[in-house]
Amino acid sequence: MKFLSFNYKDAESYGVKVKRKDAVWDLKKVFAEFGEGDFHPQTLLEGLQQNQTLDFQEQVRKAVVAAEDSGKADEFKIAFNDIEFLPPVTPPNNVIAFGRNYQDHASELNHEVQRLYVFTKAASSLTGDESTIPNHKDITDQLDYEGELGIVIGKSGEKIPKALALDYIYGYTIINDITDRKAQNEQDQAFLSKSLTGGCPMGPYIVTKDELPTPENVNIVTKVNNDIRQDGNTSQMINKIDDLIEEISKYVALHPGDIIATGTPAGVGAGLQPPQFLQPGDEVKVTIDNIGTLTTYIAKD
């Protein structure tokens, strides 16, 4: 399943993509009419949280089948052209990111890979697919992109052993880890340079892990104005997904809806010769196999 959150007619909702169509089942409406018992989650985060006691996907499947068979299915579907994409989920706790997790990317920025490099991004930096984000020209002329595979946590845990790590994943998404390279190079921490308004585009969907069975062998392609800048594969990650979850959870309790960005391959603007940073009016597209394409626009003014 591909889950998303959206605005429609000034109201926030969430849903699941209609198969083979650019449309969404509005799950707030579907559950209100066809949900079993009291299972009426109002947000995707609520659904993920309840997944610890109920099978959220199975509840969605049953409700959507009932809507499909009701004779009024179109009342519960909305075309993508009519919605504004939001971040699929806004984590109440953690947006955690890993840097230097691809050797070629670390090398292009002249960084050594000696140990895990971990930072957080402010939840206020999250934005959805097709968003226009500020160009931040008032503070930097070195705005950069980083296409990444994102992990969405599906159940709570800490000190998670590597052998069980994948059990704690609900699904995967796409993240563009927008970075102010000027601030990053001037400061001893990454939080500020990584937390600009609009600095964490995410989406368009969360794809459940059953639909992405080999997340460590998917292509990541980033284009700026249709020019390919990054063309990598998650098989190039130094620390694999289970390694990352095991290491984080030694120190940080993970909860449903938490996001983990797993690092970016080579080809960022700062690593090109000469550097090519994002400019007002640019279009950035990050595509990952079996998830989709995340599009971000840099404001002209």
Swiss-Prot record:
Asked if the record carries the keyword Membrane, the reply is no
Key words of the record:
Metal-binding
InterPro entries from the UniProt entry: Fumarylacetoacetase-like_C, Fumarylacetoacetase_C_sf
Q: Does the keyword Metal-binding apply?
A: yes
What superkingdom heads the lineage?
A: Bacteria
Chain sites annotated for binding a divalent metal cation: E146, E148, D177
Q: Signal peptide: which range, if any?
A: none
Which GO terms of the molecular function aspect are on file? Answer: acetylpyruvate hydrolase activity; metal ion binding
Residue ranges annotated as transmembrane are: none
What protein family is recorded?
Belongs to the FAH family.
Q: What is this protein called?
A: Uncharacterized protein SH1982
Organism this protein belongs to: Staphylococcus haemolyticus (strain JCSC1435)
